[in-house]
């Protein structure tokens, strides 16, 4: 997810029927995301404000909240024997990079569970997955810095300057430090943490965010653990490393060759298999726990992130022009049938509510239904603070129109983020 100014014949007939929009929006849920960093000043040390605003959220018409309890630093806001507790939140503070201290000792997640349930809300824990540190000028914070041996867990990226650089020491970017999803130690750490959450008293669900490769896109994932896993997948050492010989890849500008295709497929297989393990681990602890994932709706370019969030039944090569190269092996990495629900970020400018294509909220939701093929309920919605036309507020009247439009196509509504409701005083909106 993005924060920006706040601190993703008979069988055919059955398939088409599964992908048709519902004729009624009655009873469809409405999810609200509560980002940890962006809302820390309001709730990090104030349980009374949590209780007050859960009531206000319910009054707006939301049915579910997703409480981010593991920001990109990798510290956590719940009781854990696995992950370090968050004692201070890094970010932009008073005109420079710094920290906001957490001085309270109440259980942040439990406070939201208690207050949310009292207000009639279902409460889900949002978890940033493939991250474990935070870096800015003068700041190196989080578990990969507290325990330097864990820097070997980080993604290694092929930068534009032609260098392979560990994300923990990369100074080109500010913010979260990404971990390599192919690293077995990373996976086991995250699975153990999810098991703790699955045992949390009263928690209704878990939503994974950033369960993907890092923002260097196709140039991400070149750690030693990644190389070993890819070699195992190939059954031989890769003839090129990095696989893409020209750094700075943003989009595919040609049909990938055999090794490049295998690399793109490998990364999606890593994420697919991790999601399967995560779902199993959570449901072993609590079979009734809802287990979901957030993804961006812009699937036409999602190969960049190493995630295939579609149904494995969905014929990518024939249905998606930007995936004409996709093999049956790539199609099989579709993960939609592994989760209980999906949050789909239909992030667009405020002017792009209606339409049938990507880059419109309605189109994103419509295409989401087509791509998921009935495998999983999905809840779609906008970022109402960072996209063009939203960044200065003043869109209170538009929000119910967006919600009604999206709920005609999706199984429910999702909105990012509570910080924008607070910033622009949208509390009087009613859905």
Model-identified regions with their sequence ranges:
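Catalytic domains of carbohydrate-active enzymes, especially glycoside hydrolases
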Residues: 49-75, 200-201, 332-342, 408-413
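Aromatic-lined carbohydrate-binding/catalytic grooves of carbohydrate-active enzymes
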Residues: 62-104
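Glycine-rich, aromatic-flanked loop segments that form ligand/cofactor-binding clefts
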Residues: 62-73, 108-169, 207-210, 287-292
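Substrate-binding cleft/loops of secretory-pathway carbohydrate-active enzymes
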Residues: 132-135, 139-140, 216, 285, ...
